Amino acid sequence: MGINEIIMYIMMFFMLIAAVDRILSQFGGSARFLGKFGKSIEGSGGQFEEGFMAMGALGLAMVGMTALAPVLAHVLGPVIIPVYEMLGANPSMFAGTLLACDMGGFFLAKELAGGDVAAWLYSGLILGSMMGPTIVFSIPVALGIIEPSDRRYLALGVLAGIVTIPIGCIAGGLVAMYSGVQINGQPVEFTFALILMNMIPVLIVAVLVALGLKFIPEKMINGFQIFAKFLVALITLGLAAAVVKFLLGWELIPGLDPIFMAPGDKPGEVMRAIEVIGSISCVLLGAYPMVLLLTRWFEKPLMSVGKVLNMNNIAAAGMVATLANNIPMFGMMKQMDTRGKGINCAFAVSAAFALGDHLGFAAANMNAMIFPMIVGKLIGGVTAIGVAMMLVPKEDASAAKTEAEAQS
């Protein structure tokens, strides 16, 4: 049994605990029947529900872009392919740079990869779980949640996180290379050359974004907002056209991928968008309760991390929440000290969703890549913390240290 299978078994263990809690909550609660242990698992049933309810949000984000992937590859290919080949990189890296893996990046990367499976997975699941989500999701969503006065720390954190994405990608690529990733029994050949050469365009984009956030942060952040709105419009167009094609047979946009199984698809080998979403939700049934219960059971060690980093307990809790979903963390930012704000935003760039949606997506689409993806995301997130700690202004760091000491 490999590490990827072990991770799945662990999540299914937590899924069963959460299912028990949901059942017992109908008859007075887990504590009533299971005593102290029941009290320790109460609330996991609610996370069980959250995992399944995520299906709707995932569908809105994924289905349209998944259907559009071959169309976008056909339209963008003549421009993207020559540029990336000139840089010595695979064109699939374009997809993971701008799109989250679960918002079309994985499928667009496959279309642009030209048959290079390693490059497709490197972009679609490793890069596409770090840079793409930051640009199309995290920044626009954060701007709608955080206080205007905290935009400074968002920009600082994203800057720190962006520059360490290549470190996380290389780490994930090396784990994939040495763990012997296979698809349908066939080995996927990750090489040093592939891992390093494909980082060239990523480094260029990372440097440009970092410079923009350093010198024109407001304009850069507004630019991300505009791009995100355009992307939502495009995804909605793709979803509407795909549904019309499925229900009425009208091909409003030629070349769309089917969103349900089509004639010739082999069950278990080919999964279309709707089935992928269902598979992700099944994984999230265990992933969300796992994060809740691990946070509860190991609260003291986790809070001690906050003291080591000289930030308050709210900031430490935000980092843990980020591993499942960064939206709660952004909601907590107003209660964090300034050092914690910068560190949390930096950590979220790579590490967000590592034990949530991205884990579910990898498990549903390519479970051999679960461990490489998680390692890459966590290393990218941890190194981003180090950079953020250097970027936090000295006066903010001193204030944070004083506040952390007062809480201890």
Residue locations for each model-derived region?
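Alpha-helical membrane segments and immediately flanking helix-loop junctions
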Residues: 87-167, 312-366
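Intrinsically disordered, low-complexity segments enriched in Gly and acidic/Ser/Thr residues
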Residues: 287-288, 301-307, 314-319
